[in-house]
Amino acid sequence: MEFENIISAADKARILAEALPYIRRFSGSVAVIKYGGNAMTEPALKEGFARDVVLLKLVGIHPVIVHGGGPQINAMLEKVGKKGEFVQGMRVTDKETMDIVEMVLGGHVNKEIVSMINTYGGHAVGVSGRDDHFIKAKKLLVDTPEQNSVDIGQVGTVESIDTGLVKGLIERGCIPVVAPVGVGEKGEAFNINADLVAGKLAEELNAEKLLMMTNIAGVMDKTGNLLTKLTPKRIDGLIADGTLYGGMLPKIASAVEAAANGVKATHIIDGRLPNALLLEIFTDAGIGSMILGRGEDA
């Protein structure tokens, strides 16, 4: 039986009543959404995500999407006989891999997301950080337990973001969909972790919310319990004891920095849940883990 058919009229009314204060509160604000994980690969979740994004726009919130594409990149690398390598959660990116990353993110994933949102009545426009050179990047050197300043190829970090292109799209009533590729000072492309781009973009847009969609319920402790609120100090401890590692490291670092630099609320949420965005934004309980800025109490 379809989910919508088993919700009573009374439950629907309660859900709408609970959402109303949040709609009023967040109308006119920007929400930057890092889109990745299962929500990008499972057809039902992809469609649900697109509908949710359109609904956010309809109630006056300005969603800005920054997407990943790890599974799709891995699949293409496998087709050409290359194996993906990662260091501290970052993809090692030689010239051939960079060409594939840019082709997959800009040529396939971005267009698919744009098309899906537009199918459900939105006005999405896809952009890459190389368009108008609006995401300036510099080479990222990674520290590992064994060695500092490891060069992992054409992997960058955000040097600066010119938000004019994105703000212009928002003002035109569009939903920007951003592929996380930056441009270096010589015009070269850099693969940038989508979490880092989402965090920096949220800061520069003075976003009300930064929402990062993942394949887990949120940040978990060693016993598997969900941590609903985390301070930077607690996060430092979780990294030190090995609870947080790999792909969670750039996600957490980006969330902490965004919270410290004016983004009013940063959340790591479970993208496997239907309507995850709506559950976080429009319900009293919310879902996932909220990252607090320095000086805030959990």
Curated annotation (Swiss-Prot):
Main location: cytoplasm
Database matches in HAMAP family: ArgB
CDD domains membership: AAK_NAGK-C
InterPro entries the record matches: AceGlu_kinase-like_sf (IPR036393), AcgluKinase_fam (IPR004662), ArgB (IPR037528), Asp/Glu/Uridylate_kinase (IPR001048), Glu/AcGlu_kinase (IPR001057), NAGK-C (IPR041727)
Family to which this protein belongs: Belongs to the acetylglutamate kinase family. ArgB subfamily.
Chain segments annotated as coiled-coil in the UniProt record: none
Domain of life: Bacteria
Enzymatic reactions: N-acetyl-L-glutamate + ATP = N-acetyl-L-glutamyl 5-phosphate + ADP
Documented EC number(s): 2.7.2.8
Primary enzyme class: transferase
Known function: Catalyzes the ATP-dependent phosphorylation of N-acetyl-L-glutamate.
Annotated site, Transition state stabilizer, chain positions: K34, K251
SUPFAM superfamilies: Carbamate kinase-like
Residues bound to substrate: G69, G70, R91, N191
Subcellular location: Cytoplasm
Molecular-function GO terms, alphabetical: acetylglutamate kinase activity; ATP binding
NCBIfam families linked: argB
Keyword Kinase: yes
Taxonomic lineage from the root: Bacteria, Pseudomonadati, Pseudomonadota, Betaproteobacteria, Neisseriales
GO CC annotation, single: cytoplasm
Protein species of origin: Neisseria gonorrhoeae (strain NCCP11945)
Keywords per UniProt: Amino-acid biosynthesis, Arginine biosynthesis, ATP-binding, Cytoplasm, Kinase, Nucleotide-binding, Transferase
GO biological-process terms attached to the record: arginine biosynthetic process via ornithine; L-arginine biosynthetic process
Pathway the protein acts in: Amino-acid biosynthesis; L-arginine biosynthesis; N(2)-acetyl-L-ornithine from L-glutamate: step 2/4
Gene name of the encoded protein: argB
Name by which UniProt lists this protein: Acetylglutamate kinase
